[in-house]
Amino acid sequence: MSNKVAVVTGGTSGIGRATALALKDAGCTVYELSRRVQGVEGLHHISADVTREESVRAAVEQIMAREGRIDILVNNAGFGISGAVEFTSTEDAKSLFDVNFFGMVNMNRQVVPIMREAGHGRIVNLSSVAAPVPIPFQTYYSATKAAVNAYTMALANELRPFGVTVCAVMPGDIHTGFTAARRKIGEGDDIYQGRISRSVA
């Protein structure tokens, strides 16, 4: 992987940070994108919001102006919502899809043409074990990751003839700040006999 240019979204914490640092240790030039103002020491940080196409476009243009190529893209940016479906607003569900699914879509729409024209590239989309094994009271999170899996399989077949490989990684629970940062909707826990709070503890 030496001398390759890698881009990691959500690269300032958790899995994204660990991935970005591992790529750097492997010899890659790494750009990590997040909404935070400050990034990780030793990595190139660009403040960007994956839910905004213009923000993603500007970030990719900045990387291309500096490096002239992108060899690896890791779509890691995401968050979680927990709660019963009947007490989770449609707006909350949409915001989850905006980041976990359409954030990935926005990045890929900018990077795929670059990799296709170069004739090589690797795209890694962060999914979850919650995609094949949906988790009660994390219904919408599970749905976003199932969408990531379906999208990944289709995109892999689209891009294979151009030398671009696409895969999804499905981690289980990992000791990061992700669970603590999850947006928790506890309404209706009494109706569900405490199952909501127990399932997301």
Region locations from a protein language model:
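SDR active-site lid
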Residues: 161-201
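Substrate-binding pocket helix/loop in short-chain dehydrogenase/reductase
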Residues: 84-85, 92-94
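Active-site helix of classical SDR
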Residues: 108, 144-147
